[in-house]
Amino acid sequence: MELKKFIRDIPDFPKKGIIFKDITPLLKDKEAFNLAIEKMKDYYKDFDIDYIVGIEARGFIIGTPLALALNKGFIPIRKPGKLPAERISTSYELEYGTNEIEIHRDAIQPGDKILLVDDLLATGGTVKAAIELINKLQGEIVSLGFLIELVDLKGREKLEGYDVFTLLQE
């Protein structure tokens, strides 16, 4: 099954000049969605991982079933004001503006082995901010996993020194 055919391009969303990679057709198709998670599980099955950390919102969609498939817990990184307990935050730039993300201060203990996942690797700004949060909590990032990588935006270059897995490259 060719998973790329389940990714649809939406021009000028969320802003003019941006081509949004819509994963909802992949999510809707149970066989394609299951295959995507299984392929990621196969890559990570022998890694020493304590937790899957997913970045809001589509990182939750990939991270939660992957955590279940690997029999690991899931930790969310969220947009501001969405987490109820004490939290830490950081700001970052993305290809169409700026944003902020947060994590519970007690979510990760020093030395916890983390697989950080998101749906898309573009410029690397969001994942670098998430890495900063995990590092502040002294978690050990084992790998970075993405459903899609936009190769032309060179986000991988910002992630030197990390194991990076992408299921699809565009």
Swiss-Prot record:
Pathway where it operates: Purine metabolism; AMP biosynthesis via salvage pathway; AMP from adenine: step 1/1
GO term, biological process aspect, one: AMP salvage
Pfam families, sorted: Pribosyltran
Subcellular localization(s) per the UniProt record: Cytoplasm
SUPFAM superfamilies: PRTase-like
Chain ranges passing through the membrane: none
Keyword Cytoplasm: yes
Catalytically driven reaction(s): AMP + diphosphate = 5-phospho-alpha-D-ribose 1-diphosphate + adenine
PROSITE patterns (alphabetical): PUR_PYR_PR_TRANSFER
GO molecular function: adenine binding; adenine phosphoribosyltransferase activity; AMP binding
Transferase in keyword set: yes
EC number, UniProt record: 2.4.2.7
InterPro entries for the chain: Ade_phspho_trans, PRibTrfase_dom, PRTase-like, UPRTase/APRTase
Top-level enzyme category: transferase
Any one of the GO CC terms: cytoplasm
Keywords for this protein: Cytoplasm, Glycosyltransferase, Purine salvage, Transferase
Subunit and interaction comment: Homodimer.
NCBIfam families: apt, PRK02304.1-2, PRK02304.1-3, PRK02304.1-5
Stated family: Belongs to the purine/pyrimidine phosphoribosyltransferase family.
Function: Catalyzes a salvage reaction resulting in the formation of AMP, that is energically less costly than de novo synthesis.
Protein name in UniProt: Adenine phosphoribosyltransferase
